[in-house]
Structures are given as structure tokens and as C-alpha cells.
Amino acid sequence: MSNYGTIYTLPFKSRRNKSYIVEIQKEGYTGRVAELTGSGDAPFSIEIADDNFLYVPIRFSTATIRVVGNDYLQSLYSTGYQQYRVNFKQGDTIVWTGFITPELYTQDYTATLFDLEIQCVSAMNTLEYADYKQKSAGSKEFVSLWELLTRCVLESRGSYSAVYIPHVYAKSPADYDANANVLQSMTISEQNFFDEDDKPMNLKEVIEELCKFLNWTCVDYKGALYFVDVDQRGNYYKYTPDFSSYTFEAGNVLSVQDIHFS
């Protein structure tokens, strides 16, 4: 697992006088932390993908960091899709996690100081840049739906506080009552993730197809990752970010229609 160290912080207050801080972390970084100065009324803003269709399989978000800077910020324009992680926090609570988007460096640095906008995407959005890799080099095997789901979440490298999964499907009423994880026994051939030219799907496409099959919506919201079943009224598994343990949460943990950041 990759380690990230904080390289920049951006503290600011909202219009409602709430204190927030943006932490920009660099993969493998162990140096000193510098404080940035925010620009404008909204140094950090979040936008969630909008879709009027209730059963959309994924709804991920983007964010923008606005700072007053000079040429030392050139390093933030990375070609690596998970090189700079961004955690947006209220107090000690992460309310958004993602990465600075890889893009070409185009800012004009002729002035001593300037306003700079840095574009970010939520952690799950970075799966667009990660191709599916088969389990073994020799041949394509069968893989469980649980392996696919957990692999995609872990590959996102997001600092999610928890992962919510609906307790919906089971082989039998007895298995449902016993909280058996049916996704562990549901398998699919890896061949489905490669086209006729053997080109792989990316992991964002994989999680999207998985959610279509299960009739779920995957959404990152207020620091956690949710797999929402719009028609579910029962319990949700609340997993730790590494899927090592879970607790139960009552139904209706999140309404897809009400997703927004204030």
C-alpha cells in the first residue's frame, strides 16, 4: 500500500464561519508542510455529477482548489493520476477525498503572485486511468463479484471513512438471516473485461458494470463511499476502509436524490 505525506495545507473559513482545511498529500513524501493562501470566496468547492435518472450506476464528484501562489506550485501539475491526494476536512473529519488531475502545465507565471485553480477528481474517478489486470499472467480466470468490488475501492486509494454496502442479496432466507456474503460466491469470467483485441476495460468501467448488474449506485459522499440500492429499506453493511470488519447501519442511510455538499 502506498504512503502519502502532507506537503501543503489550505485552511479557510466558509461563509457560515465554519473552519475547514484542505490537505494536499504527495505519494512517498516525508518533508516539511507549507501553508497555502486561499483565493476568492470559495477556496475549495465540490461538484457532484448530476443525473436526473434515479438508477444511474455511478455518481462521482470533482473539486476545485483556488489559491494565491507563485512558481513553487508548478510541482502540483502531475502526470500521475494518484500522485497528489487531496483530503478536505472539517475538524478531524474528512468530508471529501480525491486526487489532483493529471494535466499539462499551462499557467502563466510572469506575475510574482497569481490566482491558481487546481482541478481534482474524487478517488473513485481515478479508476478511469487504471486498466483491469487479470489475476494470473497465464490465463483468464473466474473472479468473484466481491473481489471486483473490493479491488476497485482499494485501487482508488481514497481516504474513505467507511464503505456502505446494502444487505440485499442472498442464496436463501437462511443465508440472508445469517448475513452471508453472496457476492463472494458469485463469479464471472475475466474474459468479460477484455475486448476482441484483448484490450482491457478500466476499473471505472468495471465498477460501473458491476453496479448496473446489482442495480446499485456508487457515490462518494461526505467522506464515505456508498453503494446505494434505491429500493432497499433494510440494513447496510458499514465496512472499514480495508474491508477487514463491518457493523450494521439501519436502512435509508443515504437517498440518491438528496446527495449534495453544502
For each predicted feature, which ranges?
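Short beta-strand-centered aromatic/proline hotspots
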Residues: 96-105
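Charged- and aromatic-enriched interaction segments used to assemble
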Residues: 109-254, 258
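Surface-exposed loop/turn motifs at beta-strand-loop junctions within extracellular Ig-like
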Residues: 90-92, 214
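Residue-level detector of short, conserved catalytic/binding motifs and their immediate flanks
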Residues: 63, 84, 98, 208, ...
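Residue-level signal for glycine
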Residues: 30, 92-94
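Juxtamembrane "anchor/assembly" segments of surface/extracellular structural proteins
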Residues: 1-79, 111-155, 261
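Short coil-to-beta transition motif at edge beta-strands of beta-rich domains
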Residues: 76-89
